[in-house]
């Protein structure tokens, strides 16, 4: 559901790395470097600690690994779309693993605002995530630190309200 009220909870909860995303408008970013997605139906107040009557979607980023690895992908598409994404992972010390993932996406808009001479609904975003995982030897304890950064300079779409007799003409 789409709910813009600042005082109401949405009926389906969205969680990213066990952090509740309170409004669907806050979830306006691309998914990248995903490890798994879990979907749970029905009320989940006890399991997830939130009043989500319709269920929950939990999205987990890929975790740091104890072996070195990585990937790098680049693509080009219509409307001059450029997408570069990748990740690097591996051990930093005997008890600490790290992971860095990123995505850069740029695309021209689908429409043109002729009054202001700009593209509309363009995409210009940068996303980065860094993780440190502490796994001490001879212990069941573990800790995971995740830092996310998103910069979205996209201009979205433009709408103009019409008034008068022509407003309902179709």
Describe these PLM feature segments.
Residues 1, 105, 146-150:
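Short loop/turn motifs enriched for small/polar and acidic residues
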Residues 1-19:
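Extracytoplasmic beta-strand/coil segments of soluble accessory domains associated
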Residues 10-11, 23, 32-35, 41, ...:
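Outer-membrane beta-barrel translocator/receptor signature
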Residues 117, 122-170:
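Outer-membrane beta-barrel domain signature, strongest for Gram-negative TonB-dependent receptors
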């Amino acid at each position: 559901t789409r709910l813009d009220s600042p005082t109401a909870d949405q009926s389906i909860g969205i969680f990213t790395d066990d952090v509740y995303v309170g409004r669907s408008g806050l979830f306006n970013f691309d998914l990248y470097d995903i490890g798994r997605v879990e979907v749970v139906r029905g009320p989940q107040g006890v399991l997830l600690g939130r009043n989500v009557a319709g269920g929950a979607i939990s999205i987990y980023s890929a975790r740091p690994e104890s072996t070195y690895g990585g990937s790098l992908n680049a693509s080009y598409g219509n409307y001059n779309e450029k997408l570069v994404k990748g990740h690097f992972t591996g051990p930093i010390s005997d008890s600490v693993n790290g992971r860095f993932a990123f995505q850069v996406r740029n695309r021209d808009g689908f429409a043109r605002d002729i009054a202001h001479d700009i593209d509309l609904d363009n995409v210009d975003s940068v996303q980065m995530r860094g993780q440190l995982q502490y796994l001490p030897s001879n212990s069941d304890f573990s800790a995971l630190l995740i830092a996310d950064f998103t910069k979205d300079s996209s201009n979205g779409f433009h709408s103009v309200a019409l008034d008068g007799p022509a407003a309902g003409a179709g």
